[in-house]
């Protein structure tokens, strides 16, 4: 909570969290900035996401539709950020399937694509080949989205290490983690 307050007082206009509970804690403490959960929460959390206005990462059509239907039933929008798998292979729509995924879920009027992002597996590694492959995959996905006439919203991918080491990949927003606590990301 204190880190979020300090970040916002220093100019941060968006907050990222790992869990729904962390997002709720920030809302209940009076934080008004948009809050993004950096992974897709379980469907059971959808009512809480809508009530507390917390944006989820989305990468399955089942979750996207359930989220949209719940929002539509309340007459509100369902803003989300699309998680793109560019090579970390934990979460996300595979980079070469992004446009297909968006076409499968975009019919729902409540869904509102607010951003697109990926997670880097090796931005803190001395060896940069895997990082370069990931960034190329992510850029390829963003070009495909734009070529399809879809506004990707806020484009973001940089963690602490990438923010410092690869400033050309900062795009619209960076997601500092360890650097916010005064630590230098490896190497």
Regions found by a protein language model. Name each.
Residues 1-10, 68-71, 77-78, 86-187:
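Active-site loop/helix belt of alpha/beta enzymes
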Residues 1-54, 58-67:
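N-terminal active-site wall of soluble small-molecule enzyme domains
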């Amino acid at each position: 909570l204190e880190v979020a307050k300090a970040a916002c007082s220093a100019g941060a206009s968006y907050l990222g969290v790992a869990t729904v509970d962390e997002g709720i804690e920030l809302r209940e403490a009076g934080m008004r900035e948009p809050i993004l959960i950096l992974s897709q929460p379980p469907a059971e959390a959808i009512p809480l996401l809508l009530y507390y206005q917390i944006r989820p990462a989305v990468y399955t059509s089942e979750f996207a539709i359930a989220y949209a239907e719940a929002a539509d039933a309340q007459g509100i929008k369902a803003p989300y950020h699309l998680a793109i798998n560019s090579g970390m292979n934990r979460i996300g729509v595979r980079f070469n399937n992004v446009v297909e995924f968006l076409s499968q879920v975009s019919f729902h009027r409540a869904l509102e694509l607010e951003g697109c992002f990926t997670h880097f597996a090796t931005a803190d590694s001395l060896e940069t080949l895997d990082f370069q492959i990931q960034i190329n995959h992510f850029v390829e996905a963003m070009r495909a989205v734009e070529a399809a006439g879809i506004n990707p919203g806020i484009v973001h991918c940089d963690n602490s290490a990438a923010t410092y080491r690869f400033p050309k990949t900062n795009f619209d927003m960076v997601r500092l983690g360890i650097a916010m606590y005064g630590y230098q990301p490896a190497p």
